[in-house]
């Protein structure tokens, strides 16, 4: 057997059909595109159109809404705070708030405030001022000898709401 003897199995490769080449070819005139009109033209597809069948986006019910007054808090866990204190990124003796967390690079931005979450363990005695905290986070900070002060969240202006 030689390399030149190798061939595909019969019928495994189908010849490409050249369309629109006369009625005798069997694929002339409309070239398999149905009738005339928008769908017979090149590059045109009607988004979401399912051939007259009720499209999926209209079969499903409308649901929910976007609350323009929703506040988006930056979240920080206790283990991340402890890492920052251990690495001396933040000073544990002072008050830790949104400004100090952003200035030290622990958070990228404070968004509408900071929310303290309870993942991990906290050993350092910290004074924390945040806009929200979970029960477990508050308990863990107080167990370590620190305090948590919950600030009132900054209200969004009506013009600022997006």
UniProtKB/Swiss-Prot annotation:
<feature type="region of interest" description="Disordered">
    <location>
        <begin position="1"/>
        <end position="41"/>
    </location>
</feature>
<dbReference type="InterPro" id="IPR036227">
    <property type="entry name" value="Ribosomal_uL15/eL18_sf"/>
</dbReference>
<dbReference type="GO" id="GO:0022625">
    <property type="term" value="C:cytosolic large ribosomal subunit"/>
</dbReference>
<dbReference type="GO" id="GO:0006412">
    <property type="term" value="P:translation"/>
</dbReference>
<dbReference type="InterPro" id="IPR021131">
    <property type="entry name" value="Ribosomal_uL15/eL18"/>
</dbReference>
<keyword id="KW-0699">rRNA-binding</keyword>
<keyword id="KW-0694">RNA-binding</keyword>
<feature type="compositionally biased region" description="Gly residues">
    <location>
        <begin position="21"/>
        <end position="37"/>
    </location>
</feature>
<dbReference type="InterPro" id="IPR001196">
    <property type="entry name" value="Ribosomal_uL15_CS"/>
</dbReference>
<keyword id="KW-0689">Ribosomal protein</keyword>
<dbReference type="Pfam" id="PF00828">
    <property type="entry name" value="Ribosomal_L27A"/>
</dbReference>
<comment type="similarity">
    <text>Belongs to the universal ribosomal protein uL15 family.</text>
</comment>
<protein>
    <recommendedName>
        <fullName>Large ribosomal subunit protein uL15</fullName>
    </recommendedName>
</protein>
<keyword id="KW-0687">Ribonucleoprotein</keyword>
<dbReference type="InterPro" id="IPR030878">
    <property type="entry name" value="Ribosomal_uL15"/>
</dbReference>
<dbReference type="GO" id="GO:0019843">
    <property type="term" value="F:rRNA binding"/>
</dbReference>
<comment type="subunit">
    <text>Part of the 50S ribosomal subunit.</text>
</comment>
<dbReference type="InterPro" id="IPR005749">
    <property type="entry name" value="Ribosomal_uL15_bac-type"/>
</dbReference>
<comment type="function">
    <text>Binds to the 23S rRNA.</text>
</comment>
<dbReference type="GO" id="GO:0003735">
    <property type="term" value="F:structural constituent of ribosome"/>
</dbReference>
């Amino acid at each position: 057997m030689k390399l030149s003897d190798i061939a595909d199995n019969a019928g495994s490769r189908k010849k490409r059909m050249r369309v629109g080449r006369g009625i005798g070819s069997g694929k002339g005139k409309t070239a398999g595109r149905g009738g005339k009109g928008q769908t017979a033209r090149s590059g045109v597809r009607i988004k979401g159109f399912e051939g007259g069948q009720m499209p999926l986006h209209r079969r499903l019910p409308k649901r929910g809404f976007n609350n323009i007054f929703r506040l988006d808090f930056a979240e920080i866990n206790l283990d991340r705070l402890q890492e920052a204190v251990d690495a001396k990124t933040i000073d544990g003796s002072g008050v830790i708030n949104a400004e100090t967390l952003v200035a030290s690079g622990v958070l990228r931005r404070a968004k509408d405030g900071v929310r303290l979450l309870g993942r991990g363990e906290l050993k350092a005695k910290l004074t924390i001022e945040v806009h929200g905290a979970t029960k477990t986070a508050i308990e863990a900070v107080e167990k370590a000898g620190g305090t948590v002060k919950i600030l009132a969240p900054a209200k969004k202006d009506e013009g600022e709401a997006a």
